[in-house]
């Protein structure tokens, strides 16, 4: 019997930062499309290795290490584009389900929107990584990509995190659980 569990921690989907929403959509994506698990694992591996390389530079990137960073950046950009695309597709699949669940729960006509539209997915990640390279080397971490994205949730055009009441936030979180 399929079952949906809803608990107090589910409010973090709405109230807390973007990492909770990324985790929710990524877990949903892998649960509904298990074929993408390897893609996610590959992305995490390349990100981990790229970050380790950036940390090793200790704030300075020599010319000889520039080529290595370029290779990591190219791999990361390719895998990120694939992951960002399947994230968008998955959110497209659950948008209507979440809206319907919300309407069924409240009996109203408020519009629930789930938006994932990272700038890098349209412009290409590689040029943005190149632009952020000095800062990334200085900080020793990757600053742009799917690991930093947010999935925004709106109720009637207003950010649910800041403008929805606590009851509305609970209903939105429940709608997302039911949709997934």
Task: Enumerate the language-model features and the residues they cover.
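Extended, charged alpha-helical "arm/stalk" segments used for dimerization and assembly
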Residues: 1-53
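General structural signal for alpha-helix termini and helix-helix connectors
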Residues: 27-34, 52, 56-60, 78, ...
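Short, flexible active-site-proximal loops enriched in glycine and acidic residues
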Residues: 38, 42, 56-66
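Conserved NTPase motor "head" modules and their coupling/switch loops across ABC/AAA+ ATPases, GTPases
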Residues: 60-180
């Amino acid at each position: 019997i399929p079952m949906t569990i809803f608990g107090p921690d589910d409010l973090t989907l709405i109230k807390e930062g973007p990492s909770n929403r990324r985790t929710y959509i990524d877990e949903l994506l892998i649960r509904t499309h298990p074929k993408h698990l390897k893609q996610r694992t590959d992305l995490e591996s390349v990100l981990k290795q790229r970050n380790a390389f950036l940390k090793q530079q200790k704030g300075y990137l020599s010319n000889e290490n520039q080529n290595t960073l370029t290779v990591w950046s190219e791999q990361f950009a390719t895998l990120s584009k694939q992951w960002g695309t399947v994230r968008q597709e998955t959110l497209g699949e659950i948008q209507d389900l979440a809206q319907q669940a919300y309407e069924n729960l409240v009996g109203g006509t408020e519009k629930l929107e789930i938006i994932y539209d990272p700038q890098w997915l349209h412009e290409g990640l590689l040029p943005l990584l190149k632009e952020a390279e000095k800062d990334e080397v200085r900080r020793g971490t990757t600053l742009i990509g799917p690991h930093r994205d947010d999935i925004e949730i709106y109720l009637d055009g207003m950010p649910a995190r800041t403008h929805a009441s606590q009851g509305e936030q609970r209903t939105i979180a429940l709608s997302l659980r039911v949709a997934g």
